[in-house]
Amino acid sequence: MTTFIQNPTQQLQLRKLTGRIGAEISGIHLSSELDSSTVQFIHDALLEHKVLFFRGQQHLGDTEQEKFAELFGSPVKHPTVPAADGTDFIFELDSQKGARANSWHTDVTFVDAYPKISILRGLIIPETGGDTTWANTETAYEDLPELLKQFAEQLVAVHSNEYDYGGPKQNVEPEQLERLKKVFVSTKYETEHPVVIVHPETGKKSLLLGHFFKRLVGFSQSDSQLLFNILQEKVTRPENTVRWQWQEGDVVIWDNRSTQHYAVNDYGDQHRVVRRITLAGEVTTGAHGLKGKTTLPKDLSAEQLEKAKLHAVLNAN
């Protein structure tokens, strides 16, 4: 189904890509100069479709990507990885530097107020391969049997940046992976999140899992993994997913509070570079009001704590 939206400056077309997640918007030139009605349309479409795809945005450079992102919230840096050279907030994923995630995850869930929105721009795209798949974590929750919903709502999971990027990867030299991991876990983070969270804007429930997951509070590692596998499998079922074949100049925006994604590492030694900006989110809230809580790092100095508090205030929405 294609929806046409008219405004004084451009005619937008929105086309759903699957029954449960994803829509492509065309007829738009992304920039920081978008009028308020267009920004509102994109925001509302994002809440409904979870992931929005835009072709042909080659004009969008690093600076303009950062300015465009500010229309939807406050950009935040990655907690451990420095911003790309010449930028304030951009997180670069370069396959030649070992950045091949190749796992299902929600961005930066190892902190309590993880990003609400991610905006990804394709710079160098392989001729073949290198797609990204997104999954709808709200419909995954909705598909659970009632008793399993009730059980999941009682669970609390520990998320850590020691996980996900620490796993084995194809087409990545061990030395590259070790360098990447050292940067990624230069400060160790652990955060406890409810497994079922409530979206702060829509009020809908979803499953917060992905491969930053470490264990469930109160369960052994083996039992944690068994329960994780049961719930994670619901997220990644084909009917909950959309797969995007990248072209250079594409921009993808997703609601990081109701999705997981997976960058497919199937492009061998071809070069792939994408650049991401994330927007400040809120501390998670569970189905029964429990809040997310960061438990590590604990060894921050008083000065570091004050800086962290100031950073949180400056980036609050």
Swiss-Prot record:
Top-rank EC class of the record's enzyme: oxidoreductase
Domain of life per record: Bacteria
EC numbers for this chain: 1.14.11.-
GO CC annotations, alphabetized: cytoplasm
Self-association state and partner proteins as the record states: Homotetramer.
Family: Belongs to the TfdA dioxygenase family.
Function recorded in the entry: Alpha-ketoglutarate-dependent dioxygenase that in vitro catalyzes the oxygenolytic release of sulfite from hexylsulfate.
Cofactor: Fe(2+)
Molecular function GO terms recorded: 2-oxoglutarate-dependent dioxygenase activity; metal ion binding
Binding positions (2-oxoglutarate): T132, R272, R276
Chain sites annotated for binding substrate: H78, V108
Residues that coordinate or bind Fe cation: H105, D107, H261
Membrane-traversing stretches: none
Keywords: Dioxygenase, Iron, Metal-binding, Oxidoreductase
Name of the protein: Alkylsulfatase
Lineage, uppermost ranks: Bacteria, Pseudomonadati, Pseudomonadota, Gammaproteobacteria, Moraxellales
UniProt xrefs under Pfam families: TauD
PANTHER family in the cross-refs: ALPHA-KETOGLUTARATE-DEPENDENT SULFATE ESTER DIOXYGENASE, ALPHA-KETOGLUTARATE-DEPENDENT SULFONATE DIOXYGENASE
Residues spanning the signal sequence: none
